[in-house]
């Protein structure tokens, strides 16, 4: 999972604290796997991917899960002074968007030159809305969510009030899916801060999972498409305002419930199941969730997936067998590419603004 803070927080308690760290790293790996799974469905089969129930299920909650975990790990950053905070977050989240965005355009243009197609890397394209509002949108969304929460914690007003104010403000920001992402980020923060709230979530975990499953039954193609065209629906008056509001609320709630469901599932089984050598080795990938998100997007989604197709395979064998296998291959290959990048300090500094 893309933990935008990229910080692992150890809790007190000996072996138990290690297991808690392990299960949240594994949760990040799980979410990374989901986003790759969704991209494989989207790009490697010639069909209407929105009609695919597996795709719609993944996309109902996986980005909310990313953001919830980011909020969970954000508390140490919230204690920083203003200038170091914004410098750190810009370096961590905005710089890679620029560095990898330019790299992707140059890589794409190298291929376009060979294929005699129009070049993508031009000053107008670099500064276009398409680039800034789409490429690596989640990193930019995470930066905005961090900034909103940070500014809220710096106010002199009571906690419940700044929470309400920032939630309201988030609904007015039209880019980077902030209206849906910030509530998940904030909930992750609150769950980490409040033991009583976390206890409530644990107590009602079965109810949360059941509600998510019920909502999935009504998460149709029409609902998915409508929830992703809210701005157009409002501008073109294609739907009554009340219906638009309910559709927006539905998307928000199903995302929160889905993220919470897997959050509490990993929380519940972590202590007893995840404390094995195999899971510990797998959890290492969770420490590179930001890099996995970026590198798999550039290398596979932007480049290799354009030359691969499994359309010759039947629909359900593709979805139930091919997609999970290909997704795992992409996940582990991406991790190896990241490992290679970090072997070259200059390259890692250039692409990620850090070294390990």
Regions found by a protein language model. Name each.
Residues 2-356:
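Alpha-helical transmembrane segments and their immediate juxtamembrane cytosolic regions
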């Amino acid at each position: 999972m893309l933990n935008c803070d990229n910080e692992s927080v150890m809790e007190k308690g000996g072996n138990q604290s290690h297991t808690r760290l392990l299960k949240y790293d594994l949760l990040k790996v799980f979410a990374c796997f989901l986003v790759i799974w969704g991209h494989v469905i989207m790009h490697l089969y010639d069909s209407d991917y929105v009609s695919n129930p597996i795709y719609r299920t993944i996309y109902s909650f996986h980005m909310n899960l990313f953001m919830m975990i980011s909020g969970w790990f954000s508390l140490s950053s919230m204690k920083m002074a203003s200038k170091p905070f914004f410098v750190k977050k810009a370096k961590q989240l905005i710089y890679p968007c620029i560095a990898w965005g330019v790299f992707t355009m140059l890589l794409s243009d190298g291929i376009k030159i060979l294929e005699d197609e129009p070049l993508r890397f031009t000053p107008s394209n670099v500064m276009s809305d398409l680039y800034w509002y789409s490429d690596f949108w989640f990193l930019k969304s995470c930066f905005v969510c961090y900034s909103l929460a940070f500014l809220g914690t710096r106010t002199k007003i009571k906690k419940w009030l700044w929470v309400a104010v920032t939630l309201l403000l988030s609904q007015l920001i039209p880019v980077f899916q902030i209206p849906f992402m910030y509530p998940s980020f904030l909930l992750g923060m609150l769950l980490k801060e409040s033991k009583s709230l976390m206890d409530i979530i644990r107590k009602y975990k079965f109810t949360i999972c059941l509600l998510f499953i019920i909502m999935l039954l009504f998460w149709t193609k029409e609902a998915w498409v409508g929830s992703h065209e809210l701005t157009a629906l409002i501008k073109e008056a294609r739907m009554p305002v009340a219906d638009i509001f309910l559709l927006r609320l539905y998307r928000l709630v199903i995302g929160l419930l889905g993220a919470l469901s897997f959050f509490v599932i990993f929380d519940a089984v972590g202590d007893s199941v995840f404390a094995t050598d195999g899971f510990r080795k797998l959890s290492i990938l969770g420490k590179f969730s930001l890099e996995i998100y970026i590198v798999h997007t550039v290398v596979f989604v932007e480049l290799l997936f354009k030359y691969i197709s499994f359309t010759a395979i039947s629909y359900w064998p593709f979805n139930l067998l091919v997609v999970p296998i290909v997704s795992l291959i992409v996940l582990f290959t991406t991790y190896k590419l990241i490992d290679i990048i970090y072997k070259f300090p200059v390259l890692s500094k250039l692409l990620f603004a850090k070294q390990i």
